Structure formats: structure tokens, C-alpha cells
């Protein structure tokens, strides 16, 4: 049969598929094997199902029909998803396991059994993410976007990097010695650090040090490049190039990069008298949650690795050795607006004609007739405009809204806050 598939808005293509399943009779539920209708085996495990979804996200990074920089974005999304999964879902299961909780999930697995399966699958997923990044890195280089190492730097590169380092990086660094006289610093959630093994030049005395990498600095430093090309250096490589400026009189003998993921599961007492204060306290407590995953670069000196794991109180499968880049979520920083040829074409959603007829007045447009918006084909700006107008309209006395997820600087939240400041009753149910 002929089937028309909608691939992008207003573009169609026709292909032949076998769709006999559409006309096949459905099985009688009573004829299904008992194992499929009764007992825990009829359920998918919630956590393993989520990992399967994230495998599907990563598949888009391996899909050659997807533009190159969009594939890079999918690796970043997959890595960020896994980070969130570790800090919330895995953290919750670990807490249950530590408490000795053996209550099975709907599919019949205890927290310990689930953690074992999760760790095995998550490690495979991380390896596949690194493999996808290595393959994509070669394709990017063929398109004139190169991620170089410090060994490939020219004298001109080093001169340019020295200016960047002194002006933008050096002032915000805080190198720290690791010894009994200096307590191990607090490493925030998703924090990346360099662990260094050095010896003093004058007498060979050993020194272990830590160099936390500030999150506000871009993960990749742009290098001089011919017109039409892009060359970048990972920030940790830049720091190693300038290690003598940070530790004068010492020689580097070994190093590794590591990253910390902390328990970010939020627990609040919903019956608390002051819910706002309860959330503020919970958020502060979450910043210092215990470590649920430690990622360490492969080949780390054993003494450094031992020191880090002991200081962060992590053991066993909480430690993951990474062969490749640590913190793949920040690959999104390589997506460049000046390479539209490597991204999906821009899609401009339509503005409903009725809103235009009423010169943007949402209330008048809705008063004429109820409005149904289809996202992303019709712009979400209409929702933002509706709330912003409601926040300022003297006839609006209350706003009640459900919020699933918002951006860091959400215009929705801004409009709700403005409405509350204008004396309106505002209620939001937040996921």
C-alpha cells in the first residue's frame, strides 16, 4: 500500500511499507499466556524503560540522515539525561538499598537488583556515547570543525592561548594542595576538576593538587583558524598547557580529570506550615547531597584515584572510568549558529490569523471564538502573550496554571510573578 509520511511541516514524501498489521485481527486477551497477564512480569521496569528511551535518543546521534551539529546536540542531550537520571532516580534507589529496603518494584525487583541492572546498562550507554562522540569528531573535522589536543598546538596557538588564559581563565582559578594541612574542597554537582601529581624541582618533593574548573567558563576555547574553519581546545587541555603558571617550581608527573554527580532528589514535608521555607531548606540541602557517581578519566595515577575516591566516600560501582571526554553534556557548546548547513533549517511557527486581526489582543481574539493552538506549528508566543496580558489586565483577578517544566529565565514564570505583584491571586501546580 502507498503511505504518505509527513517528514517536516509542509513537506511530504511517499514510500512503500508493509502495513498488513493494520488489518490483522487483534488477539483475544483471554487467549494470552498467563505470564503476560498476571504477576510482575507483565510490567516494564520503570528505570530500565527510561534507559531504553535514552538509548533511543543516542540513536539519533548515530543517524547519518540527521545534520551533523544536530547529532552533536543529541549526544549532549543523551548525556544530560543520564546525569539527571543518576542524580535523581539512581540516588533514590541507592538510598533505599542502604536502608535495607527490599520492597520489590511493580516488576518484582528489589532496589539492589534494579541498581545492578541499571549500572550494567548505564555503563554500556556511556561507552556508546563516547564511541558516538569519537565518530562524530572525525566527521566534524571533515567539515572544518576541529577539536585539537595540546600536543597539536602551534607557537601561534600558544601565544593566542596565553592571552586568553591570563585575561579570562587565570583570575577565576583556585588551585589547591591536597595534604593533611588542606581539607579536601567541596566539589559541586556536575563539577569537573583536574587532579594533579607533581614534584618540586629543587628537591623532588611530591605534591598532590586539585584544580576545580569553574562552571561559568566555556568548556571549549576557540583557537585562531583560517576563514571558514573552526578550531577549539578543551578547557582542561588549556589548564595543563599553563600548569607551570599555576604551580611555579613544580613539574607535572601525572594528572586526571574527574567529575562528580550528587544526590539531587528533592524531599519536602508537604504538610509544612511554611512550604516556601521548606523548599528553600531542601534546595540548600540538595546542593551538598552525597556523591552517587564519580567519573574519572582512564589512566589516572592510582594514588590520585585512591585519594579522590576516599575523600568523596565513593566505592565500587559508584566509580566509572571514562575513556574519552568527561561531561559530554557540554558538547552543545560546539553547536555554531554560523554553520546553518550542518543544522536543520529554521522553522518559523505561524501566528494565528485571528490574533493578527485583533492586533495581538488575546482576550479579544478568544472572545470572538475559542482558540486551539497546535505546537510547534503555531507559535508558543501566543501562550506567553496571553499570560502577560492577563498579568496586566485590571479585570483579571486570578490565574491558575499547571507547569510541567520551564526554562532558566522563563517568560511564563515572569508573567505569573508580575501578576502576583499586581495583586492577583496566582496558583501554580509545578511538576
Question: Where are the predicted features?
Answer:
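N-terminal localization/anchoring segments of enzymes in phospholipid and broader phosphate metabolism
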Residues: 2-431
Amino acid at each position: 500500500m502507498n503511505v504518505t509520511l509527513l517528514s517536516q511541516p509542509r513537506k511530504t514524501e511517499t514510500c512503500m511499507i508493509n502495513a498488513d498489521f493494520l488489518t490483522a485481527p487483534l488477539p483475544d486477551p483471554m487467549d494470552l499466556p498467563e505470564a503476560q497477564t498476571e504477576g510482575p512480569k507483565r510490567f516494564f521496569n520503570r528505570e530500565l524503560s527510561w534507559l531504553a528511551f535514552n538509548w533511543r535518543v543516542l540513536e539519533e546521534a548515530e543517524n547519518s540522515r540527521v545534520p551533523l551539529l544536530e547529532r552533536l546536540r543529541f549526544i549532549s542531550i543523551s548525556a544530560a539525561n543520564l546525569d539527571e537520571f543518576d542524580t535523581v532516580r539512581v540516588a533514590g534507589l541507592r538510598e533505599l538499598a542502604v536502608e535495607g529496603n527490599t520492597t520489590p518494584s511493580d516488576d518484582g525487583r528489589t532496589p539492589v537488583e534494579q541498581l545492578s541492572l541499571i549500572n550494567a546498562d548505564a555503563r554500556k550507554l556511556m561507552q556508546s556515547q563516547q564511541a558516538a562522540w569519537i565518530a562524530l569528531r572525525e566527521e566534524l573535522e571533515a567539515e572544518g570543525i576541529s577539536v585539537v589536543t595540546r600536543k597539536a598546538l602551534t607557537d601561534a596557538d600558544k601565544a593566542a592561548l596565553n592571552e586568553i588564559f591570563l585575561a579570562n581563565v587565570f583570575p577565576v582559578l583556585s588551585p589547591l594542595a591536597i595534604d593533611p594541612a588542606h581539607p579536601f574542597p567541596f566539589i559541586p554537582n556536575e563539577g569537573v576538576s583536574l587532579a594533579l601529581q607533581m614534584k618540586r624541582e629543587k628537591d623532588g618533593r611530591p605534591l598532590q593538587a586539585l584544580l576545580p574548573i569553574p562552571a561559568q567558563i566555556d568548556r571549549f576555547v576557540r583557537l585562531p583558524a583560517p576563514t571558514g574553519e573552526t578550531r577549539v581546545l578543551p578547557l582542561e587541555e588549556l589548564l595543563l598547557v599553563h600548569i607551570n603558571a599555576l604551580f611555579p617550581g613544580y613539574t607535572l608527573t601525572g594528572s586526571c580529570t574527574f567529575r562528580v554527580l550528587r544526590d539531587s532528589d528533592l524531599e519536602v514535608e508537604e504538610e509544612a506550615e511554611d512550604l516556601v521555607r521548606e523548599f528553600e531548606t531542601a534546595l540548600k540541602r540538595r546542593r551538598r547531597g552525597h556523591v552517587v557517581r564519580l567519573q574519572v578519566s582512564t589512566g589516572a595515577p592510582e594514588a590520585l584515584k585512591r585519594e579522590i575516591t576516599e575523600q568523596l566516600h565513593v566505592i565500587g560501582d559508584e566509580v566509572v572510568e571514562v575513556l574519552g571526554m568527561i561531561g559530554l553534556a557540554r558538547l552543545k557548546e560546539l553547536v555554531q549558529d554560523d554553520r546553518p548547513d550542518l543544522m536543520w533549517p529554521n522553522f518559523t511557527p505561524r501566528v494565528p490569523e485571528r490574533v493578527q486581526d485583533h492586533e495581538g489582543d488575546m482576550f479579544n481574539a478568544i472572545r470572538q471564538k475559542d482558540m486551539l493552538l497546535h505546537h510547534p506549528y503555531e507559535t508558543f508566543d501566543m501562550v506567553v502573550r496571553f499570560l502577560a496580558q492577563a498579568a496586566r489586565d485590571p479585570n483579571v483577578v486570578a490565574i491558575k496554571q499547571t507547569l510541567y517544566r520551564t526554562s532558566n529565565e522563563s517568560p511564563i514564570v515572569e508573567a505569573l510573578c508580575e501578576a502576583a505583584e499586581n495583586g492577583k491571586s496566582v496558583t501554580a501546580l509545578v511538576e
